[in-house]
Amino acid sequence: MIIIYYTNQYYFSVIISVYNSGRYLNESIGSLINQTIGFENIQIILVNDGSTDNSENICLKYKELYNNIIYVKIPHYGVSKARNIGMTYAKGLYINFLDSDDKWESNAFKYVALFFKLYKNIDIISCRIKYFESWNHYHFLDYKFKQTRLVNLTQEYNCIQLSASSSFFRSSSIKGKYFTEGVFSGEDIRFIFNILLIKPLLIFIKEAIYYYRKRSDSTSAIQNTEINKNFYIWTIQYVQQYLIDKSISLYKKIVPFIQFYIAYETLFRIESKAYKFLDSNNYIKYCNAIESLLNQIEEKFFLEQLIFPIILKLFALSIKNKSDINKQLILRNESIIYSNYILLNLNKYKYLIIWRIVDISNNILHLEGEDKSFLSREKYFYFCKISNQKYYPKYNYYSVYDFMTMFGNINEGRVISFDIPLKKNNNNQVNFFISYNNKIIEIFPSFGKFSHMSSLSHSYYTKENFILKKINNKLAIYPYQHNLENSFENLYCIELKKINKEKIIDLRTQHFEYKRNNLNKNYKIWMITDRPDQAQDNGEYFFRYLNKLKPKGIIFYFAIKNDSFDYHRLRNLNNIIDLNSEDYLKFLLKSDKLITSCSELFIKNPIGEDGKYISDFYNFDYIYLNNGIIKDDLTKYLNKITQKFSTIITSSKKEYNSILNNLYGYKENNLLLTGLPRYDNLFRLKKLIQTEKFILIFPTWRMNIKGTRDLVNHNSIKSEHFKNSIYFQFYNNLINNKELLQIMNKYEYKGIFCLHPNFIAQKRYFIDNNIIQIKEICNNQKILLKTSLLITDYSSVFFDFGFIEKPILYIHFDYDEYRRNHFPEGYFNYKKDGFGPVCYDSKCLIKNVEYQLKNKCKLKKIYSKRIKQFFRYIDDKNSMRVFKGIIKYKNYIFKKTYYFSSKIFLILFLVVCIKIYFIF
């Protein structure tokens, strides 16, 4: 422990603005108490900025425990005011502004103290930012920390410092300086640059780590800037333009480090999705404000940005110059040049093509990936060579690769693919080339998701009778040999050991042993799932079908988290696996098929980023049972490059065609038109369960409401700003609408408002009553069957309700916003194809509810007709068709079947017999 003697009472003063951060506050304060420099050298000033959670209790607890902790309570003014008030209590030589949900590495203050003593003329020290919780990366600008050093911004103008929380300030240098109050975003930047414009010197300490919490519920201030409309126009005026004007007033010019920062900020803003949130008037104002920044900054400061794609930088310059910069690019010595600035070297740049899918089938090498080039497409084309034979690619267009910006789409997504025949007993080598302006250059492709190869140099992939391996800018393909595979595996494990991946090595060793011992296995393994924490969907019903069928040669498992309700409900069945266990991963790697109704990444890759090191073992067919009928345009989320489904289950010819003919990238052999397995049970129970006087209100979720699901634990997360959303306000008002409740009471109806799984943690905000209750889980089919009337917005649950031919009301109070922020409209038009009336406000909805209750919730003929036209099958043979389709039974998919009762069948049989009698 270091004991320091100085005239100030403390060496450090740490000011923490606290606002509703009770969940994290213990961790933040604990990181200060545990500093190796000694907590007696640190003063903490806790400023409670009007918190409404348990933050005050935590603050008071620490104040009672430690004399060097001060607690101040103020109304909710905002972080700037809270910090300014905190500074009036500071008695330390050096000041830090720790955010109340972040924390410090335990030795950080020790390093900072050392460098402040060494450099007595320095006023700012910057520490390295590392994200934690839902991210595990260093900050975008981490290149500044290549080494611990003193930086003069007049020379290294790209080393901009944007965070006050990860900085330490000499208290004497900030006397009389304050954070600008009322600023929602950018208060740190304005505060820091006001100091640096006077003295552009600071120290970067690589070893001192500031941990920035990237919240799973997306409720931090930085994460929510897109939601607060002040960020768009207000901060351009009061932060970016302010700094430009301040620099000009001091130096008669915009100094380079301010220009570099403005270019950095402008590119972020061009790339933002503000067009989703702003009305047309504010959108135009915002674009004009961005253009104003562009016009004040020199070109080179955009080109020198390291973290942005080249295509974005060139697009920004095209806006600035009002001309297409791409047409001004030239090729010189294999380099692409603009205005004497080298953008990239074509034969060294690794991201012209990223192969997303690499596969071998029937001695054909299939490569499919993303064309990442920013070049004018009329000027170049790709080809590859194998054994001096040239092959040219096919091009497809997937919307997932569109690059949408504030000023429109700057890159039409393009997928490139090769199909190359391989010679069985020969060593093959594939070389890749680009022809640009008639000059041929060998290029260096990269390998991404579903390529079965990681970024490590000794990564390889075994498939059929071949072994694939990257060698520099080539793809080498060898005939399979046991010894060669062993050699490659040893080299790969040595490389994994160097990066401390011992667990991955153990996993690979176990799996190799399994493969060697089961070369001639006479059975298949099928892994089946629904959501990680919830069953009762197509996965469970298909699993139950297999349990009854007991197909020979197939071992099937159902996986779900062991802390879920459904895990304990299903425990009496055989082969139930905990989705969170190591067993799940081991069985998944052994599986021939992964059959799931859930498209979450965790299902197919339960170990996150480390999954890339075992991606060569992911050889199962990936079968998507669907968690509902696809009606919207989901090309961005379910396309082949993003998901790589082997098979997708569909229920309607319209749904089938929308996937086949749209930009999903799938072919007929990837699609089955069978119906959903859960419909079997729904069809059977329809005859057994009687409808009751019951209304089900069942809306879907919204992508633009942050805090939907925890990316780590896959659970719903509480979100403070959920209660301010239009979504919450509409539905909370609806379920408590006096007119609606009076109508329901008059006709003796009860109701349930069902929360989407992504919003379960938000239940606390809703207010129920004695007529409409709020429930978390409503996917029990018995609830649907007991229900007389369904009210929904865009949830595909209405297809289930239509399947059993019951009335539906749609409420589209936020239709434009939903289409803008959630999913674009697909083939299904609610007015033309819907199974019920569409309302756009609560008045229309309540009127239709009254009509339905008055008429005993009878389905109108027009909607009954639409339902029958929509579904390919209305029977209980869906699981059977899925099973047959999976095991490659043919000639049944498009034969429309009708379900006859035994009585109807008997009548038809008698009619046929009578006709035959009279004929003869």
Question: What does each of the following model-derived ranges do?
Answer:
Residues E668, R764-N769, S796-F871:
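Catalytic binding pocket for nucleotide-activated donors in carbohydrate/polymer assembly enzymes
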Residues L601, P606, D621-Y624, I777-H822:
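A donor-sugar binding/catalytic signature common to diverse glycosyltransferases
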Residues N362-S591, R881, F900-F918:
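N-terminal pre-catalytic "stem/leader" segment of glycosyltransferase-like enzymes
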Residues I505-E513, F620, N626, D632-N724, ...:
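A nucleotide-sugar donor-handling region in carbohydrate enzymes
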Residues K252-K253, Q259, D533-N547, P677-Y765, ...:
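Conserved catalytic-core segment of nucleotide-activated headgroup transferases in glycan assembly
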Residues Q510-N522, G836-F920:
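C-terminal amphipathic helix plus adjacent low-complexity
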Residues L367, M404-M406, Y523-L682:
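Active-site and donor-binding regions of nucleotide-sugar-utilizing enzymes
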Residues M1-Y238, I695, D800, V882:
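Nucleotide-sugar donor-binding/catalytic module of glycosyltransferases
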